[in-house]
Design a protein with these regions (language model features):
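Residue-level detector of Asp-centered blade-edge/turn motifs that repeat once per structural unit
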Residues: 29-31, 69-70, 113-114, 159-160, ...
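Signature of short aromatic-glycine-proline-rich micro-motifs recurring in repeat-based ectodomains
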Residues: 298-307
Length: 425
């Protein structure tokens, strides 16, 4: 019925180098540099920050970088040959070399303390939603050796290689904040000689990303609210919060010589293991990033939250955070919002067919925006307060009244019969 819609995303690319909240992911730390994933590629920057250097440029995604103990080599997860496998490359850059060849997904996790083998996770021998940890010689050759653990995902060796701190449970909904169901993550410490374990104490919190440093096992946890850094002392069996809660979750972290690098709100930070002090790492990115250029995107398969105009002539959709209308028969598609920094959701047509209401987070909190169905002029904005709204039709109540003396000024009523003027002064 409706024709395919192609929407021009009017992005605003940076004219020069980029700084600030760049969504720098999965950082790894050596004695001199930090390697991280950005826009599907690996980048390197000095520990003190500065201009980042691009290490990979393949069409697929490269992520999960981990430094060898001497800092000379990086193991990472890549998609160079149409499959997700483990690769290694010099820390200074170079041609990646493939280590794993299983048709399933293999992902880099770490290194053995002697730097001779790469630790990786794979579901190659585990049914359902499980996985196991394996090691493979960094020089290649031979078969992967499976660690003696039934299910294991993330892992970090003790200095002598005799023990491993690991996560023994797969969690399918990792982004569920403050989840307290049956799949909360935990960290166990395994004696690799006999597979006996010690459980790091917790009260059904999500503990993950273990990092062994000296006699301590550092890890990320939401046991006190937002995810931050804690450590477990293997000598005293006590748990201490290393970094105070900041309100924003830490997403990943990696231990290196004398410090831990972690990502928070798209930025990188260093935690000094001796002083306990933290500092932000200022990173500047400059490169050819096609994703930042304005480009056409076919959104025919991404249309959602549809509504039909009262006369049936057009339909409105949400697609990639934009509000679009398309004709039933004749006419052109219309991008009503054309925004670059906001998410617009849940469009609904007014009963008279003249306006379209939708939810927008342009101000930082969701507001009810109303624009004429042609998309011309500024949208009227109705603040909704600091609450969660998921349906513009529910907020609007599908009711339209008129202000006294202003017959062309619609009023939308909220669920508590609160009135908000849309078209009047």
């Amino acid at each position: 019925m409706y024709r395919i819609v192609c929407a021009l995303l009017l992005l605003t690319p940076c004219a020069g180098a980029q700084t600030g909240h760049l969504l720098l992911r999965k950082p790894a730390l050596s004695g001199t540099q930090i390697v991280f994933s950005y826009a599907g590629d690996l980048w390197s920057v000095a520990r003190e920050g500065g201009d980042a250097k691009r290490l990979t440029t393949a069409p697929g995604v490269e992520t999960d970088p981990v430094f060898s103990p001497d800092g000379s080599t990086i193991a990472f997860t890549g998609e160079y040959d149409g499959n997700v496998d483990v690769f290694v490359m010099p820390a200074s850059g170079g041609v990646p070399r493939r280590l794993t060849y299983h048709p399933g997904r293999d992902a880099a996790v770490g290194w053995t303390p002697d730097g001779k083998r790469v630790l990786f996770v794979s579901a190659r021998a585990v049914p359902n939603d499980g996985a196991r940890l394996y090691t493979l010689p960094v020089e290649g050759g031979g078969l992967p050796e499976e660690l003696p653990l039934p299910i294991a995902l993330e892992g970090s060796y003790s200095a002598d290689g005799s023990h491993l701190a690991y996560v023994p449970l797969f969690q399918w909904q990792e982004a569920w904040k403050r989840y307290r169901g049956g799949q909360t993550k935990k960290i166990w410490i395994a004696n690799l000689a006999d597979s006996s374990i010690v459980k790091i104490p917790r009260d059904n919190s999500n503990d993950f990303n273990p990092m062994w440093a000296g006699d301590r096992i550092y890890f990320l946890s939401d046991r006190e609210g937002p995810v931050t850094l804690f450590y477990y002392d293997t000598k005293t069996n006590k748990i201490t919060r290393a970094i105070a809660k900041h309100g924003l979750d830490f997403k990943s972290a990696s231990a290196g010589p004398g410090a831990i690098v972690y990502e928070q709100f798209g930025e990188l930070h260093l935690y000094d293991l001796k002083t306990g002090q933290t500092k932000a790492v200022a990173v500047t990115l400059a490169g050819d990033l096609p994703e930042l250029r304005p480009h056409y995107v076919n959104v025919a398969k991404r249309l959602r939250n549809a509504d039909i105009s009262p006369n049936g002539a057009r339909a409105v959709f949400e697609a990639r955070g934009k509000i679009l209308t398309v004709p039933a028969e004749k006419g052109d598609p219309r991008n009503l919002t054309n925004s670059t920094t906001a998410m617009e959701r849940e469009p609904v047509w007014s009963p008279d067919g003249q306006n379209i209401a939708y939810l927008s987070d342009e101000s930082g909190e969701y507001a009810l925006d109303i624009v004429n169905e042609v998309g011309t002029g500024e949208a009227a904005k109705i603040p909704l307060g600091k609450a969660f709204y998921s349906n513009a039709a529910m907020v609007a109540g599908r009711q339209e009244d008129r202000l006294p003396g202003q017959p062309q000024s619609p009023v939308l009523r909220g669920p508590r019969s609160e009135e908000a003027s849309v078209g009047g002064d």
